Each structure stands twice: as C-alpha cells, then as structure tokens.
Amino acid sequence: GLSNPTTSGFGRKTDFNTDTPSPTDNINYMNFVGDNMSFGKKVTSDNVRRLVRKISWSRGTKYEMYRHDYNLNNTSPITGSARLYDANYYVMNSDFKVYVCIDNGSSGINTTGNASLDEPTFTDLEPSKAGTSGDGYQWKYLFTVSPSDIIKFDSTDFISVSNNWSTSTDSQVVAVRDNGNSDVNNNQIKKVYIENQGVGYSNGTGQEVNILGDGTGGKVVVNV
C-alpha cells in the first residue's frame, strides 16, 4: 500500500451558499472538511496510476515528431509547443496500444510533415511504418494499456501508465523495457532530420556523412 495513506472525501451535509469559500491550508480547515463530508474512501496503490495526456490516433491528422530540442526559439511546428511534453508526438490507437512518432515525413522544406494515413497496430520493437500509404511516418511501439487499467482508469483526457514499469514481470512490459535498456539500442540514432538539403549534389546512393557528437566513428548513409 501507500506509505502515506490517502483518503478521498465525498459529499457535504449542507449546501454551500452561492459564494463558495476558497480552500485554506491549515488544520482548522481540515477539521471543517472532515466534519462536513458525508463519507470517505481510502485510496490504495491499486487505485492510483500515473497519467499522460491522451492523444488518440485519427486518420488525416498531423502528428509531431519526437525531438529533444523543442524550446522557445524552436517550437514544435504544429502545436507551437516550447517543450516536448506539450507536443503531440505520441498516440494511442483504437486497441489501446501507445506509440511515439519517430518520423512524420517532415524536413527543412516540409516543416509540419504529412497527415498520418496508416494507424499503427504492430508490436514489433523496431521503429516501423504502419502501412503502405507512403505517408512518411515511422512509429515506435511503447506499451499496451492493460484491460484492468482500461476498466478502472480510461477517460477521454488521459492514458494510464503502469505504476511498476521498472519492476514489472509482465512479458509485454519486460520486452519493451529490456529492448530500450539494451546495449544494442542505447543511444542509437533512429532518425536524421535534414534542415537544408543543399544543391549541386550528384545523384547516387550510399554516400557517407560523419556524425558529430560525443562518440567517434559514427556515420550516416545519404541517398541523393
């Protein structure tokens, strides 16, 4: 259970007047609330979940690409968000599977990307396109909301997230967690964004470009 038990109170024995008082953070007000509520219910850890904003996948909608560098001077191109957490960079599909958008077909000449046409449904752990429309999207599967959490916590506004992600023995959670933590996948580059495509390059495939970062020897292959 919770180390600091929480109780949720309901109701009031008498009506509030039209000028509802503002809550006050002191012992006297806590006693007032306790004296006036109809009943209370202890909230256990089984009845608590972390929540994230619900963004449901919908055909024809543009979703933002995951980027680590959104800020006041580089806002997300669709929602104008100054930080990643306010951008629409992930979705939940109709089967309660959650995905992060790795690529939305955007570039320096198409800054807002394309409309998403294929609903992601796969559970493979490698980022993949969702269908054959050619919409330019690449999705990374994150997790599936469990049936019990759907019943208890599903709402129009929020997605529930497992409380024990780091210790869960659920096979689906373990597979995603271990894949993300593996030496193979840690610090991989899954997407290269071209801000300026330049001019005058010869057509061809397999041209190598150095990656500048905190490692050594990294290269990407560019097809012109």
Protein language model features and the residues they cover:
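Beta-strand-connecting loop/turn residues
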Residues: 96-97, 187
